[in-house]
Amino acid sequence: MGVVAEILSMNRNIQNLALWSLEGPFDPLASVITQIISVQRFSINQYYLFQRQPHFDWTNFKNLTHLDLVIDDLELGIAGCKSLCSLPLLTHLALNSGFTEQLVPILLTNSSNLKLLVSFCAIDLDVDQMQDLRLVCLSAPIEWQEDWYYGAHGRLDFWSEAETAQQRKARRQRARARDVSIDLPDFIAATSNLRLA
């Protein structure tokens, strides 16, 4: 872990960062990561950050636009979500968690800048939350590293797939709304000449 923290401390202008399969101790890493404020795309297991800091504050990441977050602990996940909601540029958030059902409502309600919330787990939410265009459920990429590499280099990745799924969801909702809507003046005009027997 010391090597990772050392490398990161020497490179402060990082825009794309993925930290996976790390082994502790994580304290040096957490303190270095909070100083890399230039990161825009970030993928990490929240355990690396929250292990000893249950109230890890995401607000230092002012430039963060895309966050792929693995959450293994509900209490820590809720604490992290509260500060995530205040990030001014965070528009894309992916959750890989068994606690997605508990976290999605918090994020949808409190994240005004969030445009896309991806869940990689099956979830059972109320109808209004499932109808929210920001929420998209996907299968996890088979090759995370390859997917991350493609996205970091401007190619198609799971974010692209999620945006396409979001567009399909919006089209389906518009089509459903057209199917069930009745133009009341036309309905009245069409039925006004009917006589009751």
Residues covered by each model-derived region:
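The conserved beta-strand core of Leucine-Rich Repeat
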Residues: 1-55, 59-77, 88-100, 114-125, ...
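Leucine-rich solenoid repeat modules
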Residues: 84-197
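Short, T/G/N/S-enriched strand-turn elements that build extracellular solenoid repeat scaffolds
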Residues: 5, 31, 82, 105-108
